[in-house]
């Protein structure tokens, strides 16, 4: 802050601010107190300012560290590293409507929400990911199986069952049909009969249909969260992988002790990226999963193991680990609960690493748990058909309103010059952030991703196409397509949601989003 205070002697900030405001521009000054805060504190504060400047951020982000101040270098580096992740998290309408349709099928079928009002939080939970070190340490889980709540995450369930174990809870997060594909390959009726599915509301309805008992949860940063739940009912940081989901659910339930197995987020050898008994080394692995593994192996990066040794990881695993570290930090600081790392992979911050002997010592005096009572207590009250239809109509009214307001703003664009394109795009973004989000809350996520993608594409090409005739052609077509999207949005939404839920004949729930492309064009 001393730099800013000193600048007051030589800089007339008021005149600068007024000149920027006169042109419709803006300057933000972020002043810290008590010196420069560490990157994990400073970066989010700066980040929350920058994301209000879309599409200029991240498209035109230029970082100038005045007088090369050393404390600011890690802050800038962290934000630069998160920019691509930011772009990949925007989402888009096609995926949102697909998830929403899945959610309506699940609610219409009477799937109840997960509740947590009267549960035993002292119950230790073992949460299992699909990392290769699960094979090394599975025996200690077997020794203490009756003393823990066993939670499988996504594809890790194949390794758990292959080891002769059966989870109490299985968690899933993805709305893609690959979720159904991998679960449908399990030939153990006992799993579907006795294991409780805790899945995101937007799971394909076929997934809930596989299980005798299934409850849904609401993940953060989605329109579904504000439509079908309260803030206290939203599960935070459940993405990007099912492993995150398992830890997020345990954190949401405020379980006092969690043990993280198979959460390696890295591997010592390039061909040891998952447990040997996982679906990734099975002849049942689908072509889609094979292609995904192949692409990931081309983008390996190095990280540090829990023992301080170098190891390999995928960018997605790195992101997943960082997200879990936010959960373990929340558990340690705010919940005063314990997170134990029982994996032999990458180091996970805010956890205590336990050897097999230390795990045995922990459970020596522990008694067997009453998991059945715990699982029954998680069942909430499902929505009625009438309540569901009211939510559908409310979202439809929201889409109609923003379609009109954004169309008016877009039609004010009379030139293809970059400055004019940016001006209109910034106006639309400010409308979204300052008008739509305050009024509709998380519901705005339903359309935010597609709006941001359109704005980013228009501005990026207005800058990159130097030939005026080519730029005129592209921006004119971009404006037309953007306007048509906004115009058709309410009618398309109504065409999808006007059915009676659940509807076994609905083609949307029989394929994944790629296979449904022909339906989006109708």
What is each PLM-predicted segment?
Residues 226, 287, 291-308:
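Surface-exposed acidic, glycine/proline-enriched linker/cap segments
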Residues 1-128, 132-149, 158-171, 177-199, ...:
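N-terminal donor/sugar-recognition subdomains of glycan-related enzymes
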Residues 148-149, 238-241, 274:
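Long alpha-helical, hydrophobic tracts
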